[in-house]
Amino acid sequence: MATIAPAPPPTIALDVRRLPRTLPWYVEVWVQMLRRKPLGTVGAAIVLVMLLLAVFADALTPYGFAETNLRERFVSMNGAHWLGTDQIGRDVATRVLYGARISLYVGFGAVAIASLIATLLGIFSAYWGGRVDLLLQRAVDAWMAFPGLLILMSILSLLGPSVLNITLVLGIAAGIRDSRIVRGVALSIRENTYIEGARAMGSGHTRVTLVHILPNVLPTIIVVATTGLSTVILTEASLSFLGLGVPPPYPTWGGMLSLAGLDHMYRAPWLAIWPAVALSLAVFGFNMLGDALRDLLDPRLKGG
């Protein structure tokens, strides 16, 4: 008796190019930036290079940032001093590298403080609403009614210039300002039906805030923090230029521009050129990176 062999199971050809992506959202953001945002990629590259130079400044230069040599005053660019020396023989390249370290330290520290304050104030104000929201927003309005740089100068004049003081002051000022942006996003999220559903199912205020509101506000916080870095770095340079920033002997880009002054501008223009170039590149890099992240993380702009 003949037997019938079972038919082989059908084969299904899968096109791996059409399979859904399983990358984490933050990895997907960087992949999309590489594909669609060339200026954002350039900004990210500038920021990465600046971070590496700041971290490995000790290994990249044989000189100390406060090391002087009066016999080599105003030496122009050469093999020993790639960016020349200043009025007391300090190596300009070394000071620019260490200036990047100070600027990034103040920038990241202030932005971390600002993000925490903005998140707490913005979400708290939006979630509770009513009188709480009214009082907090009127306090923010009163703060923003005064010129920001004037307030910072006044506070630092009382506290004294130091790395810690300028980081705290810049972080608090930026956090109060950015809390309004976070509040606006949190207000729109609070009105969604899933928030009402979570409350109806018995979720407490803490769970609703941490599980349902905070994750949806996080992309906005990332964008605000990235773009805020350029503002913080530029403000720190302005305060250092005025003598209210990080005190000597620590080098800052604003302090180097102040020391160059008109007295040495024509004799040794590199004293002002290289700190200005470094500051401009830092601001450009963080601005381009922040703009690209905003376009990729904001659902209203993802098509741009």
Show where each model-derived region lies.
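Hydrophobic alpha-helical transmembrane segments of membrane transport/permease proteins
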Residues: A2-L14, A45, V49, L53-I88, ...
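Alpha-helical transmembrane segments of integral membrane proteins
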Residues: Q87-G304
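Transmembrane alpha-helical segments of polytopic membrane transport and secretion proteins
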Residues: M1-A45, M288-G304
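Cleavable Sec-type N-terminal signal peptides
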Residues: V27, A45-F56, L116, L120, ...
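Cytoplasmic juxtamembrane interface segments
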Residues: E28-I46, S203-T220
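A short amphipathic helical element positioned immediately N-terminal to and/or at the very start
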Residues: Y26-R36, W82-T85, A93, L210, ...
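Structural signature of transmembrane alpha-helix termini at the membrane-water interface
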Residues: V31, L52-Y63, F124, S179, ...
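Structured helix-beta-strand junction loops
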Residues: R36-K37, M77, N192, R267
